[in-house]
Regions:
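Hydrophobic packing within well-folded, soluble alpha/beta domains
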Residues: 25, 55-58, 113
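Generic structural signal for short, flexible, solvent-exposed coil/loop and linker residues
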Residues: 2, 6, 47, 59-62, ...
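Axial heme c-ligation environment in periplasmic c-type cytochrome domains
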Residues: 1-22, 29-32, 37-42, 67-72, ...
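Sequence/structural segment immediately N-terminal to covalent heme-attachment motifs in c-type
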Residues: 37-64, 76-77
């Protein structure tokens, strides 16, 4: 709601929500069953793993972030992850760290990274 994260759809939707509304939505989403993603193309997964070294610094070796406010990548939809990387590169989504991460990534590298992270098990966070 602060407007720090720019998204035309979500900024408009969140503007009218109270803190209680947001808490209720978060609880509802947290209670939904995890859908196991397709393991994807093995060649793309391997390429993604080879390119993910820089990603591991923030998102962890298994796609679980080192900071609680950063997103879990493990098990996310490949299409969603690919779209988010493209949005960071085009400037339609902004995060100060991600701008530098994606600036030299080609679309094929984004697809490979998305394929790698989608096949990781996102059903339960590591203990």
């Amino acid at each position: 709601r602060s407007g720090e994260r720019k998204n035309v759809v979500m900024n408009g939707m969140a503007a009218g929500l109270t803190d209680a509304d947001i808490d209720e939505l978060a609880d509802w989403y947290a209670g939904q069953p995890w859908v196991i993603a397709d393991n994807g193309n093995p060649n793309l997964v391997e390429e993604g793993l080879n390119r993910a070294g820089y990603c591991h610094a923030c998102h962890g070796m298994k796609g679980y972030p080192v900071a609680k406010d950063w997103p879990i990548l493990a098990g996310q939809s490949a299409l969603y992850l690919d779209n988010q990387l493209q949005a960071f590169k085009s400037g339609t989504r902004y995060h100060p760290h991600m701008v530098n991460v994606v600036k030299d990534l080609e679309p094929s590298a984004m697809t490979a990274l998305a394929s790698y992270y989608t096949q990781l098990n996102g059903a339960a966070a590591p203990q």
